[in-house]
A protein has these predicted regions:
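Charge-rich, low-complexity N-terminal segments
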Residues: 1-59, 100
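Short histidine-centered catalytic/ligand-binding loop motif
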Residues: 8, 66-74, 126, 130
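Ordered, soluble secondary-structure elements with a strong preference for glycine-centered loop motifs
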Residues: 13, 17, 76, 124-131
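Short, charged/polar surface micro-motifs in flexible loops or helix N-caps
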Residues: 47-50, 56-61, 71-76, 91
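Short, internal acidic amphipathic alpha-helical interface segments
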Residues: 66-113, 117
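A short, solvent-exposed beta-edge/loop patch
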Residues: 104-138
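Short amphipathic alpha-helical signal-transduction/dimerization elements
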Residues: 138-145, 149
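Short, highly charged C-terminal tails/helix-capping segments
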Residues: 148-160
């Protein structure tokens, strides 16, 4: 990849649009994809869905893609949940478990959103890597969500 000269302006919005189009074209070769209200590409699998979001890194003139699949919404934050996430966050080849607690001033205080996620740099994505990483994220979340919600509480994507 050839970087633009430092004096040339980089258009983050155009770069994100180009990355989204590239990823969409590559994924359409493999599976059906959707587009949600927030502009995220989506792929459904079993009881969950992977969301692909695109973010610019202006100082690097790159776009990164997050692949995120819900495991549980509204899971109570307990010592057992935190220990499970700490011990198991990175046990997969691709992706990892993560959580995002709901705001303290929300009705869901004391609860968290648990998900499986991975990140790619759009400019360097090739078709095989995109396929493997996308399905690794969504298939892992699909395999984990039922047992996870039974053990720790919360609601699966399919049930939300």
């Amino acid at each position: 990849m050839t970087e633009a000269p430092p004096t040339q302006e980089w258009n983050a919005e155009a770069a994100v649009d180009a990355a989204r189009q590239k990823v969409q074209t590559l994924l359409l070769r493999e599976t059906e994809i959707g587009l949600d209200q927030r502009g995220r590409l989506t792929v459904d699998r079993g009881s969950t869905r992977v969301f692909l979001e695109f973010y610019p890194i202006p100082d690097k003139r790159l776009v990164y893609v997050t692949l995120t699949a819900p495991i549980a919404f509204y899971a109570p934050i307990t010592p057992e949940l935190l220990e499970h996430l700490a011990r198991n966050a990175d046990k997969w080849y691709f992706g990892h478990l993560s959580m995002n607690p709901y705001a303290d001033d929300s009705e869901y205080k004391g609860q968290t959103y648990v998900y499986f996620t991975d990140t790619l740099i759009a400019e360097y994505i090739d078709p095989e890597e995109l396929r493997i990483r996308t399905f690794a994220v969504v298939d892992t979340a699909n395999a984990l969500d039922e047992e996870f919600t039974q053990q720790f509480g919360g609601t699966r994507y399919q049930d939300s």
